[in-house]
Structures are given as C-alpha cells and as structure tokens.
Amino acid sequence: MKIIFFLCSFLFFIINTQCVTHESYQELVKKLEALEDAVLTGYSLFQKEKMVLNEEEITTKGASAQSGASAQSGASAQSGASAQSGTSGPSGPSGTSPSSRSNTLPRSNTSSGASPPADASDSDAKSYADLKHRVRNYLFTIKQLKYPESLDLPNHMLTLCDNIHGFKYLIDGYEEINELLYKLNFYFSLLRAKLNDVCANDYCQIPFNLKIRANELDVLKKLVFGYRKPLDNIKDNVGKMEDYIKKNKTTIANINELIEGSKKTIDQNKNADNEEGKKKI
C-alpha cells in the first residue's frame, strides 16, 4: 500500500513538473516570436531605408503658424479700430461689413492655402502624418510587449512624435531609435538563450528560427555576457585611450606650431613698426 501511494505521488510530481515546464516553454516561445517580429519590423522601418521628412511641410507649417499669429494680431487691431470708428461716427451696415471682410479674408487665405507639392526628384520624402502614424503604431506595439524597462524610452519617443520638429530630431538623430533596437535585440538574445537552456537534452522542441547554431554561439555569449570577458574589454578600452592620446598629441603639436608661427609673425610686425618709427624720427 505504501509503495502504491509513493508511486502515485511520484507520478503526480512528474506530471505537475512537466505541466509547469510546458507552460513556461509556451510563454517563452510566444515572447520570443513577438520580440522577433518587433526586431525585424524595427530594422525594416528604421534601418532598411532612411526616413526622410518632407522639409517643405516643416517650413510651410512654421510659416502658417507665423501668419496665423500675425492675422490674429491684425484682426484684433482692425476690430479695435472699427469699434472706435463706430462710436465716433454714424453706425450702419457699411461701417461693419468692410472690417469683417478684411478680418476673414486673410484667415481664409492662410488656412486654406495647401502646402506646395514635394520635389519630384526627392521621392524618398514622406509626409509627417504618414511617418508619425507608422512610428507611433510601432511604439505602441513595443509597449504591449512589456519587456523590462519598456515604458520610459517608448513614452519619450511618443512625446517627440507629437511635434513635427521633435519628430525630425528623432529620425535625424537616431539615438533613441538605436537604443530601442539594441534593447530589443539584447532581450531577444537573452530569452533565446533561456529557451535553449530549458530545452536542453531534447527535453522540448525548439522552433527552427529560435535555435542557436554552433557558429553563432560565441557571438551570443559575447552579447549576453557583456561583450566578451572583462579583461578583453579593458584591453580594448586601453587601446582606445592610447589612440585618443596619440591623436591629442598630434593635435597639440599642430596647435603649438600655429602659436609659434603667429608669435613670429607678431614679432616681425613689431620690428617692422619700430624700424618705420625710427626712420620717421
């Protein structure tokens, strides 16, 4: 009886362990597939071809904003003048309609004026609305993944997308974009290594696109474990510092040569001035 009870408890433990492992395996695969799609979409969106914002749209929006402000100030001045003329002179329909027409005509011209078409040769330039829609949809998808530290950077990028000048800074600088793609790629590599550890010894089947091949194992280790060993990193940093110092030495030498040359020129000019002064005396 005790043996049967022991066997039942042992079987229950094995089944429960397999269920937990299967659930974690399924979650890992789902996360990895979503991350893989996000990484590929990000690279095709930002790095396959450079985003080019229509420059004429930026200048047109800036000009329309300035003309709108001047139109409002002109309208307020004209309405004040018409109010004064209405109080001093006779009131009538002819005293109000010209001012109202003069107030409405400039506004209609500035607001209804369409932006000029983009240059036909600049075929890569896209409108702000189109690029903003694509980038915002991608950032909202990233936020739904809920990977570690997945809120601050996408929220910051979404804030930049709200303004055309901030959006131009975002796509021209590429600092935030590169940081986001790096984090996504790093997290994908980390979960991929975890999945291969979970499915070690053929315990579970790894999807073909998520398997770690022998030729990429070293690269993945460098990526996950901090780009090689700390000693190699220190050697690289020392080499970079030496190159930096050498460049600075050459720069300092060139600056000293310029200083010496300028001193000689100043001394020669002083001597020439002194000789001319002596001749005049």
Swiss-Prot record:
Forms a complex composed of subunits p83, p30, p38, and p42 which remain non-covalently associated; the complex is formed at the merozoite surface prior to egress from host erythrocytes. Forms a complex composed of processed MSP1 subunits, MSP6 subunit p36 and MSP7; the complex is formed at the merozoite surface prior to egress from host erythrocytes. Within the complex, interacts (via subunit p38) with MSP6 subunit p36 and (via subunits p83, p30 and p38) with MSP7 (via subunit p22). Forms a complex composed of MSP1, MSP6, DBLMSP1 and DBLMSP2. The gene is MSP1. Residues 101-110 have a biased composition (Polar residues). Residues 1-19 form the signal peptide. Glycans are attached at residues 109, 248. Residues 63-126 are annotated as: Disordered. The lineage of its organism: Eukaryota, Sar, Alveolata, Apicomplexa, Aconoidasida. Its main location: membrane. This is Merozoite surface protein 1. Residues 63-100, 111-120 have a biased composition (Low complexity). The keyword Repeat applies. It comes from Plasmodium falciparum (isolate NF7 / Ghana). Keywords: Cell membrane, EGF-like domain, Glycoprotein, GPI-anchor, Lipoprotein, Malaria, Membrane, Merozoite, Repeat, Secreted, Signal. The keyword Membrane applies.
